């Protein structure tokens, strides 16, 4: 007697497929179209149609090749509030990022809660000479206490939520520096929309920072993937390294 396994899809109606997708979103917050198609034994075209219907009903948000249960467009949020989100993950990412530093490095550090966690890790763990150029007031104050670190605080208008100097003064000053590495955080990493942040001003400033550094490094926790900010910084192809956490903190180098 021969037996065969029938695909789950043979037993699922459209409504049941939709429930399957929504149940996974409620549990994990994120699903890949390819994974759902394989699990249900249907084509990716079928799942894309299902996702499109569910998005039209306001039940999920479609991003490139996947769907999320939350709106992928992020708002400008106070840096102190961000600091309490995924704190342990950011600390692990920060410790991994310290491993990328070399003695006598000259680096640019942007603003953000993950960058501040990086600054804290530098103060605890890095014992060599370092030159730091930053727009972030909190980083300047923290690292200025370290004997081996020279801090250059860039001027400009202080953005109230990010505590970062922004605008023409900061951008003009950056042109005077040639640094080995840029470390910056982001609000969104998306295959289709690239690297984004929540404001146009921060995006423009980061673009100028990129032109003043040889190696471009993003520090981002897992919540930033599939998200989109209002201001586009660059494409993924322009990034050299992403330090993130998938199970544990790791470096993904292009």
Question: What is the role of each PLM region?
Answer:
Residues 1-6, 253-254:
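Short, small-residue-biased leader/transition segments that mark boundaries at the very start
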Residues 10-25, 30-36, 41-43, 55-56, ...:
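Conserved phosphate- and dinucleotide-binding cores of soluble alpha/beta proteins
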Residues 10-34, 38-40, 45-111, 120-127, ...:
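HTH-adjacent hinge/linker in prokaryotic transcriptional regulators
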Residues 95-98, 102, 116, 120, ...:
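Amphipathic, non-transmembrane alpha-helical secondary structure
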Residues 107-108, 132, 198:
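Conserved SAM-binding loop
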Residues 121-141:
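Catalytic core of membrane glycerolipid acyltransferases/transacylases, capturing the structured
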């Amino acid at each position: 007697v021969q037996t065969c396994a029938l695909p789950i899809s043979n037993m699922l109606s459209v409504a049941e497929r939709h429930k399957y997708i929504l149940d996974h979103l409620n549990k994990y917050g994120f699903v890949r179209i390819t994974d759902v198609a394989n699990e249900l034994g249907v084509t990716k075209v079928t799942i894309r149609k299902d996702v499109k219907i569910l998005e039209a009903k306001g039940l999920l948000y479609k991003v490139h090749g996947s769907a999320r249960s939350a709106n992928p467009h992020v708002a400008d949020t106070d840096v102190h509030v961000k600091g309490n989100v995924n704190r342990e993950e950011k600390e692990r990412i920060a410790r991994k990022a310290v491993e990328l530093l070399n003695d006598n490095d000259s680096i640019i550090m942007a603003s953000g809660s993950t960058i501040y966690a990086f600054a804290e890790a530098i103060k605890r763990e890095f014992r060599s000479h370092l030159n730091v150029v930053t727009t972030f007031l909190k980083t300047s104050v923290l690292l200025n206490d370290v004997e081996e670190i020279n801090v250059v605080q860039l001027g400009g208008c202080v953005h109230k939520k990010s505590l970062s100097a922004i605008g023409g003064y900061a951008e003009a000053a950056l042109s005077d520096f040639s640094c080995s590495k840029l470390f910056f955080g982001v609000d969104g990493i998306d295959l289709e929309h690239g690297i984004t942040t929540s404001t146009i001003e921060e995006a423009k400033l980061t673009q100028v920072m990129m032109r003043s550094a040889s190696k471009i490094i993003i520090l981002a926790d897992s919540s930033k993937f599939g998200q989109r900010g209002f201001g586009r910084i660059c494409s993924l192809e322009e990034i050299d390294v992403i330090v993130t956490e998938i199970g544990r903190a790791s470096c993904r180098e292009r």
